[in-house]
């Protein structure tokens, strides 16, 4: 994934990615570079434009990402409900704290 991300950074900078540029990005990020992986990346991406790769990736994300928003929505709803319960409990505890003794008035 790091190698593909480095490739994407070079492409987004406006340059046509080459092995040396991808290696430079990886080196700047502190990644231990394996030349065989760089070679494999360029073999896999040979003949494909960056725009084509992005379009292909988006179509894959759309197909598999439909369940994620529902899970996030239910988590957000649970967090709101938990916060409301905590607030209610806190106000009940505060009401119990003042029993009318007036010791510190």
From Swiss-Prot:
Pfam families registered for this protein in UniProt: Ribosomal_60s
Keywords recorded for this protein, A-Z: Phosphoprotein, Ribonucleoprotein, Ribosomal protein
InterPro entries membership: P1/P2_N_sf, Ribosomal_P1/P2, Ribosomal_P1/P2_euk, Ribosomal_P2
Keyword ATP-binding applies: no
Any one GO molecular function term: structural constituent of ribosome
Family: Belongs to the eukaryotic ribosomal protein P1/P2 family.
SUBUNIT field: P1 and P2 exist as dimers at the large ribosomal subunit.
HAMAP family reported for this sequence: Ribosomal_L12_arch (MF_01478)
Protein's name according to its UniProt entry: Large ribosomal subunit protein P2
Record organism: Leishmania braziliensis
Gene encoding the protein: LIP2
């Amino acid at each position: 994934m790091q190698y593909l991300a480095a490739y994407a950074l070079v492409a987004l900078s406006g340059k046509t990615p080459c092995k040396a540029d991808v290696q430079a990005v990886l080196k700047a990020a502190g990644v231990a570079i394996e030349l065989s992986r760089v070679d494999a990346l360029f073999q896999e991406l040979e003949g494909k434009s960056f725009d084509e790769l992005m379009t292909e990736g988006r179509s894959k994300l759309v197909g598999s990402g439909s369940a994620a928003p529902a899970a996030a929505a239910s988590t957000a709803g649970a967090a709101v409900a938990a916060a409301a319960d905590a607030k209610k409990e806190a106000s009940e505890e505060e009401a119990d704290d003042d029993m009318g003794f007036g010791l510190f008035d």
